[in-house]
Amino acid sequence: MIRLDRVNKSFGHLRVLRDVSLNIEKGEVVCIIGPSGAGKSTLLRCINHLEGIDSGTIYLEDEPVYRYERNGKVVVDSERRIEALRSEVSMVFQSFNLFPHLTVLENVMLAPVHVRHEPKEEVRRRAVALLAKVGLSDKIDAYPQELSGGQQQRVAIARSLAMQPKALLFDEVTSALDPELIGEVLRVMRQLAAEGMTMVVVTHEMGFARDVADRVLFMADGVVVEEGPPKQIFTAPRHERTRQFLQTVLERNAEAGVPKDTA
């Protein structure tokens, strides 16, 4: 469904993605783990076309969105086509990005009404159903500042689902939350995975990656170092860099008394 072929991305002299190739099948849950600065979030932003690429090709359902030609130029699809593709691959951010002056319901309805020009009543019915799905039926008239961080993140997930995307990208969506609020967000994500939603998840929640992912990718220094089924990555990683990372994470969690996620 989503395919990257030798994608490269730099910010100035810093190479953030180095010849990254990746194939994500429909209905697959792929979790991306790795240290800070590995290029994980940039990879998601390139898939969602929030960042351009320097070379390589990105495909959505076998249609190239960015492609690199022999003359050294990256050819980008039309902006209109990019917007259409962006609505098919929605992204949920670490910082929620809700509009503070709009109610929860208005935040969820905004893009389908104003970007896709869908009938308002139809969108309203869908938004109400989605807020029920994420456990927020009683908050539809609330404003973001009246919600906890976990509730705001669930609104952000409902907002992404309102565009009826073919895939969802999650960029460390629990990292800004208090520990006791993480579980409520992970429960929603587990439900989406069980329903067959295609998901690419950048996460530090190792329990979620181990239990929910079909495949885990370990990234470091802009490269996919290793990928495989969760059991193989977490119990028998092939690369020393992967082993070092997992050992560090597990030791840090043990010192902090962080329990395995129970979502």
Report each predicted region and the residues it spans:
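A short, proline-enriched helix->beta-strand linker immediately N-terminal to the Walker B motif
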Residues: A162-K166
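H-loop/switch region of ABC-family ATPase nucleotide-binding domains
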Residues: T203-H204
